[in-house]
UniProtKB/Swiss-Prot annotation:
GO terms for cellular component: mitochondrion. This is Protein N-terminal amidase. Residues 19-453 form the CN hydrolase domain. Belongs to the carbon-nitrogen hydrolase superfamily. It comes from Saccharomyces cerevisiae (strain ATCC 204508 / S288c) (Baker's yeast). GO terms for biological process: protein catabolic process; protein modification process. It comes from the Eukaryota. One of its GO terms (molecular function) is protein-N-terminal asparagine amidohydrolase activity. The lineage of its organism: Eukaryota, Fungi, Dikarya, Ascomycota, Saccharomycotina.
Length: 457
């Protein structure tokens, strides 16, 4: 039987991994690249002078970290697009990686050799070399304005090598090297495709579970819900003006200019303060308390990683024969995505059919809502680290970004004392996700955490 095949897996060794992760939160404004770079170095200088500073292994920046985000036409963004191995974003990442001997991941607007434009994130290794470039797979409405292209590859994984960051459980120090499987998701990648795909497809997080991703890195420009996104309002001058006045008043109440806060830094460096768990029903999206995270969005981000969360009802799905149909009918990407328009999927299919592991790869490793044919919760007993770098500030007087950058650990555990009839919370109350710390919604700054987790080799 197919389900029995999974039990033929080889025995694996558990490694304990320790990484120092630094997240930078910025408020970049269009036309202010140099100023944003200057503030970045100012933040990094303050980070290194902290009494609790430790050298980071990874530094993650937001989506479009230096350029600003709200471009309304192709001609508006063209002065800021660059090739993947040149330009201000690459040069900054290269300098940071060489200085700190770490990986740097930064979001930027890309112009490829065929003059196609992408919303991308580049990865620079500790030697200052660009080793991976990811292009956003699911696009937000704003990107349509400047002819952004979908990533024809779809979601991807890539290896990240870390020196002396791992050990066996019976060893005292982290003296082993480890290669982690990583994946990047840029903002809208976390949401349903075009906001029209079924909510419970959880495309990106399902991809990560299916492919045993251990390190999930998300540069973002995610909005606070007080932003003006309603198309009827945006296309009605009187409604738009009233809505913009409301935002301006909210900013004034917080003592902020129309662009939001810049140059006032919130630093959470090396402490162990975790983000308090707040149920979805109690979280507010009001734009106040700039040094506190937007828990409404934090809870939503956690929900979008549902396949990583403990959920008791999975045992019932596992017993249901319709699970097989759901898994076998699952496509790699939504069928109207660019992935299916250039023949790439046909190449992938040929490669798959040539593999001796075709049954395991196509069936046993696939999940629906986190459930596979081999086990009710495929992620059970595993660990993964999620790092979200979101920008803050305001653009156009209409768009407020949610900030709240943070670091999370999915521990793969059923909550202690949980009974079979207990309901599973699908927000920050779910104990299978650990909130290792968040920045506030409205301030630039940095958060540095040492994260410890298990991987199997």
């Amino acid at each position: 039987m197919l389900i029995d095949a999974i039990h033929g897996a080889k025995m694996s060794t558990k490694l304990l991994v320790s990484l120092k992760v630094l997240v930078i939160q910025l408020n970049p404004q269009i036309g202010q690249v140099d100023q944003t770079i200057k503030r970045t170095w100012s933040i990094l200088d303050k980070v290194t002078k902290s009494a609790t500073y430790v050298k980071p292994d990874i530094i993650l920046f937001p989506e479009f970290a230096l350029t600003g985000y709200s471009f309304h036409a192709r001609k508006d963004i063209l002065p800021y697009v660059t090739k993947k191995d040149e330009g201000p974003s690459f040069e900054l990442a290269k300098s940071i990686s060489e200085k700190f001997q770490c990986y740097t991941i930064i979001g930027y607007p890309e112009d490829d050799d065929e003059q196609k434009l992408y919303n991308s994130a580049l990865v620079v290794n500790p030697q200052g070399e660009q080793i991976f470039n990811y292009r956003k797979t699911f696009l937000y409405d704003t990107e349509m304005n400047w002819d952004c292209e979908e990533n024809p590859e779809g979601f991807q994984t890539f290896p990240m090598d870390f020196s002396k960051c791992a050990k066996l459980s019976n060893e005292d120090s982290y003296n082993r090297d480890v290669t982690l499987k990583a994946s990047i998701g840029i903002c809208m990648d976390l949401s349903p495709y075009k906001f029209m795909a079924p909510f419970n497809h959880f495309e990106f997080s399902s991809f990560c579970v299916d492919n045993n991703v251990e390190l999930i890195l998300c540069p973002m420009a995610w909005l606070n819900s007080t932003s003006i996104t309603d198309k009827q309002t945006l296309h009605n001058n009187s409604l738009l003006e009233a809505a913009k006045n409301k935002i301006a008043f909210a900013l004034k109440e917080q003592g902020l200019p129309l662009a939001g806060s810049q140059g006032i830094y919130q630093l959470k460096i090396g402490d162990s303060q975790r983000t308090p768990r707040v149920p979805s029903d109690d979280s507010t999206s009001e734009y106040k308390d700039m040094d506190e995270p937007d828990m409404s969005n934090v809870n939503y981000w956690i929900l979008r990683f549902f396949p990583f969360l403990y959920f008791k009802s999975r045992i019932n799905w596992f017993k249901n024969s319709s699970l097989i149909e759901s898994i076998l009918g699952k496509t790699r990407m939504p069928l109207d995505h660019e992935y299916y328009k250039d023949g790439k999927h046909k190449e992938d299919t040929i490669d798959l059919l040539d593999s001796e592991e075709v049954i395991k790869d196509t069936v046993l490793e696939k999940t629906f809502l986190g459930t596979s044919l081999g086990q009710p919760w495929k992620f059970q007993g595993k660990n993964a680290i999620l790092v979200l770098a979101n920008r803050c500030g305001t653009e156009d007087g209409t768009t407020i970004f949610a900030g709240s950058s943070g670091i999370y650990k999915f521990n793969g555990k059923k909550p202690k004392g949980s009974q079979d009839d207990d309901e599973s919370s699908l927000d920050s109350l779910n104990e299978s996700v650990e909130l290792l710390g968040n920045l506030g919604k409205g301030l630039e700054g940095a958060i540095l955490r040492e994260v410890q987790f298990e991987v199997f080799r």
